[in-house]
């Protein structure tokens, strides 16, 4: 009851302290107006008090805003240069990154075999993505997931695509999958494979058999990534280099051509 009263007061304060809601914004000063708009979507989606409170508490992520408001910061690696992309992304040489992928597969061979048997996505692809996203679980991100997701969805250039993920992030808070303060990527990515919240809701699976799908379980996250690729047309046993059907499927994971080429480049060199 006390939480309900506090939430009601907080929401009322939010409504009274800002002008009319805004569907999307291009100025940081209007972030409160966007939160009002999003609150309407959140309540319509049936998200409860914990999720609504997380929205009240969410601040604008400066890291996310700077990245989204400056498109030139999102470039810098020439097309068709996957080795350079791997080095820039991983902080080591492409050759060393590929060696680390092989080592990670060797240490988790049973897990990868089980996932490939079920979904048809090879270990080389999954372990490459895992390494690129979080250095195999070594760094899961430093931005509060809710703040990153809400900031990204507020920006007018991004909101049609990313607002559903912001709502999903608040639903994950409401369900207890993450907390209001759980940290991840600057776009609201979470867990070992840095799923966007809406994608986790859609494709997250229980890979380790403990009865729940957990993005912070490496096995669950890997199985869920395989499920996402297979659900979007991955063809087991087929090549995945540029020009193939499977290469096109990689775009559902990340729409950057540089990223897709880097996955294919590394995974092809990792081998079986």
Where do the language-model regions lie?
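Phosphate/pyrophosphate-binding betaalpha-module
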Residues: 156-181, 185-189, 193-194
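Cell-wall glycan-active module
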Residues: 1-155, 171-177, 198-272
């Amino acid at each position: 009851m006390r939480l309900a009263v506090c939430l009601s007061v907080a929401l009322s304060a939010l409504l009274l302290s800002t002008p009319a809601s805004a569907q999307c914004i291009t100025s940081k000063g209007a972030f409160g107006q966007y939160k009002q708009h999003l609150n309407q979507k959140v309540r319509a989606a049936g998200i409860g008090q914990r999720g609504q409170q997380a929205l009240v508490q969410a601040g604008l992520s400066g890291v996310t805003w700077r990245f989204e408001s400056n498109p030139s910061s999102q470039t810098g690696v020439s097309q068709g240069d996957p080795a350079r992309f791997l080095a820039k992304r991983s902080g080591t040489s492409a050759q060393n990154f590929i060696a680390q992928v092989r080592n990670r597969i060797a240490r988790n061979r049973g897990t990868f075999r089980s996932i490939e048997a079920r979904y048809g996505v090879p270990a080389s692809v999954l372990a490459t993505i895992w390494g690129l996203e979080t250095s195999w679980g070594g760094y899961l991100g430093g931005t509060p997931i809710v703040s990153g997701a809400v900031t990204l969805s507020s920006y007018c250039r991004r909101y049609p695509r990313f607002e559903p993920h912001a709502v999903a992030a608040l639903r994950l808070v409401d369900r207890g999958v993450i907390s209001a303060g759980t940290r991840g990527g600057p776009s609201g990515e979470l867990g070992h494979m840095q799923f966007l919240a809406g994608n986790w809701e859609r494709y997250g699976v229980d890979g380790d058999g403990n009865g729940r799908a957990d993005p912070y379980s490496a096995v669950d996250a890997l199985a869920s990534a395989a499920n996402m690729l297979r659900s979007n047309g991955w063809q087991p046993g087929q090549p995945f280099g540029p020009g193939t059907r499977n290469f096109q499927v990689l775009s559902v994971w990340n729409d950057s051509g540089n990223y897709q080429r880097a996955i294919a480049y590394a995974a092809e060199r990792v081998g079986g």
